């Protein structure tokens, strides 16, 4: 019996030894992005799946672009969810048959109320935005800079430190909004509202 216990302890110790070695290797290869924007306390640079373990800057920039875009969309989604939960709706009808915006329920239930053609229009519009509008056509100042020499809102009047601070704030708020909209959707499916009545 003692042999079985000893053998199981030895096997479990051997099982975890390579994982520690792998973690050291992963940290060493990710040092290239340790000082990038978004590598902030308490986590620092966080890449648990090793997506940029090879140190590829182009791949990192693409993932950062996607993170910023999804963060911006999630911020709009959280704001839209809160607006709808407070009973604020667009005036008029969503289709020619007289279905008013007021009659459409919030959240996932809206998908069963809107016609297939309406959902197809929404998907087509999002596809149009993705392929034609939401593009960085000028090679902006940073990844995710969609000003395209058209919209500025005073961005160029800030010093470099303020710009970095504002970009870090946007990145963190986008990350929080992604978790926030996910939490709202999960709680909706669980039948629990996070919004006080």
Swiss-Prot record:
Subcellular location(s) of the protein: Plastid, Chloroplast thylakoid membrane
GO biological process: photosynthesis, light harvesting
Stored Pfam families: Chloroa_b-bind
Disulfide bonds: none
GO molecular function list: chlorophyll binding
Membrane-topology annotation of the record: Multi-pass membrane protein
Transit peptide per record: 1-31
GO CC annotation: chloroplast thylakoid membrane; light-harvesting complex; photosystem II
Transmembrane segments: 73-94, 114-134, 174-196
Subunit text: The LHC complex of chromophytic algae is composed of fucoxanthin, chlorophyll A and C bound non-covalently by fucoxanthin chlorophyll proteins (FCPs). The ratio of the pigments in LHC; fucoxanthin: chlorophyll C: chlorophyll A; (0.6-1): (0.1-0.3): (1).
Protein name: Fucoxanthin-chlorophyll a-c binding protein E, chloroplastic
Taxonomic placement: Eukaryota, Sar, Stramenopiles, Ochrophyta, Bacillariophyta
């Amino acid at each position: 019996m003692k042999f079985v216990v000893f053998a199981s302890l030895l096997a479990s110790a051997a099982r975890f030894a390579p994982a520690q070695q792998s973690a050291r290797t992963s940290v060493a290869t990710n040092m290239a992005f340790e000082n990038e924007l978004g590598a902030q306390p308490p986590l620092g640079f966080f890449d648990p799946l090793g997506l940029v373990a090879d140190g590829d800057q182009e791949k990192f920039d693409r993932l950062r672009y996607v993170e910023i875009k999804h963060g911006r969309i999630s911020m709009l989604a959280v704001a839209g969810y809160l607006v709808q939960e407070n009973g604020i709706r667009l005036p008029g009808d969503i289709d020619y048959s007289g279905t008013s915006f007021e009659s459409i329920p919030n959240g996932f239930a809206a998908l069963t109320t809107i016609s297939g053609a309406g959902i197809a229009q929404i998907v087509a519009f999002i596809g149009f935005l993705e392929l034609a509008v939401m593009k960085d056509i000028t090679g902006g100042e940073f990844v995710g800079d969609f000003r395209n020499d058209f919209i500025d809102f005073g961005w160029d009047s800030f010093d470099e430190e303020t710009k970095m601070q504002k970009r870090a704030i946007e990145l963190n708020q986008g990350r929080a909004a992604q978790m926030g909209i996910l939490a709202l959707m999960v709680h909706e499916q669980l039948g629990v509202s996070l919004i006080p009545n």
